[in-house]
Amino acid sequence: MKKILFLAILLFAKMALADDAKNEWHNTTLSDATIEKIQAAKYEYKKCVGSEMQKLAYQQQDFRNATDAIMKQCEPVLTKMREIYTEAEVPEVIADRHLKQMRLQTTREALQGMMFSEAARKAGNKPQ
């Protein structure tokens, strides 16, 4: 009985540690042109966020609500980047992870900028 249980545990452990081949990907498979497209889409996303942050309507809102509205406004730009990943046959798991990381990082930066802007307004110094 102990041997059967031991073999079952070993078999289960092997199955649990087996690599999922469809999610396995190596970064060397992307061409330089694809990398440039991804970088261009990332630039467009950050440019969208930056231009939205400059709008007066967002400057007058609470910084949390304004940041949320800005991120929702620029979300379609990330769709273009997702399409680039799909065309390059990058697994969805990896593409989603990168997009989530970039979205979170940009949200943090925008939130920090909006907090600074609001603090400067409350202090009486208007940023230029």
Segments and roles (model prediction):
Residues R64-Q128:
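Compact alpha-helical subdomains of small soluble proteins
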Residues M1-I4:
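Positively charged n-region of N-terminal signal peptides that target proteins for export
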Residues N27-E83:
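Short N-proximal segments of mature Sec-exported proteins
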Residues D19-E24, N125-Q128:
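Short acidic DE-rich linear segments
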Residues L7-A8:
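Sec-dependent N-terminal signal peptides
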Residues A13-A18:
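N-terminal signal peptide c-region/cleavage motif recognized by signal peptidases
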